[in-house]
Curated annotation (Swiss-Prot):
Lineage, highest ranks first: Eukaryota, Viridiplantae, Streptophyta, Embryophyta, Tracheophyta
Keyword annotations of the record: DNA-binding, Nucleus, Transcription, Transcription regulation
Protein known as: Protein WRKY1
Tissues where this protein is expressed: More abundant in apices and young leaf primordia than in fully expanded leaf tissues.
A Gene Ontology term for the protein's cellular component: nucleus
Assembly behavior: Interacts with RS2.
Cellular localization per UniProt: Nucleus
Pfam families on file: Plant_zn_clust, WRKY
Residue ranges flagged as DNA-binding region: 326-392
Amino acid sequence: MEGMEEANRTAVESCHRVLALLSNPHGQLVPSKELVAATGEAVAKFGSLTAKLSNSNGDGLLQGHARVRKVKKPLHIFDSNLFLESSAVAAAAAPAKTPSPSPILGLQLFPRYHQFEGSSSKDPVRIPTQFPKRLLLEKPTAGMEGSTSQSPPIVQMVQPVSVAPPAGTPTPALPPAHLHFIQQQQSYQRFQLMQQMKIQSEMMKRSNLGDQGGSLSGGGGGGRKGVNLKFDSSNCTASSSRSFLSSLSMEGSLASLDGSRTSRPFQLLSGSQTASTPELGLVQRRRCAGREDGTGRCATGSRCHCSKKRKLRIRRSIKVPAISNKVADIPADEFSWRKYGQKPIKGSPHPRGYYKCSSVRGCPARKHVERCVDDPSMLIVTYEGDHNHNRVLAQPA
């Protein structure tokens, strides 16, 4: 057990040394060979520690039923072979005249440092504390002249460039998990785009087909028109796909581009159209060809496309003395009436009777009779609708 603790301690200390070299706060020059040696030592220490832990019968470390728990190896997004490269393998794969690339360049943990043909592998590498915005490149003249002086190479700041890998280096293939994640992101973006287009088309239809949805403006017959959509106060969140509809405010008006509404933040424009062409597919409401009779209903037997709103009917009420205490006794007038129903009144012991004109078949005139609450000897007669015929001598009711 003491050997296990000692191996663990040495592995952690070697890892701390590598981290200390990488996170140099003073920005000093760190030789690449020293960094490679420290990294290899740390990997070797942890490898020996793993071997000791996995050996259940070695040196009596594990006794009885105690076992080391092994966690299943998760799928890695990056290729694990990049982290196992060593200087010997890289030197064997590269040509003799080409300097061996540093493992840091293979790991791609930091920006790539371009090395020219004249530079040596012993040249120190500056490890930044954070990712720099620019890449450090050695001055080209220092490598071309082939000077053998021991002075450090001159470093200049240049714009970031993309350094291509060597010609013989195979491109690492992405694992299936990473490809599946990219496909999911692309499908989700397409779904969001389709939802936004669907919402915009629905709002366009509602604004065009509504009674008060759109108003036409502009004098020119061939002027271009636009639908103004205001995105000023929209604060979309990713909580649901319908948040875009709740936060989007639409102005249901069609305005000319040369008018006062051209300063809107977002506009959907249509092409040049004539005055006879409907604006943006504006469909006029179809009206039935049949004429309306006095009842307010269409005379056609087919499906009616008229508005179903109830017309405002003018009512007039008069007070007349009651003939008797019977509910059916109502005063006669110049028209004949037929009772078709009655309804109790809240707060009154007497019901309200409903009558329709029976002088001519199909007359839309109606009236209802009820007793006055304050004076039961008086009747309140309310007329509704107009007669569509001349006066006929009424029979006594």
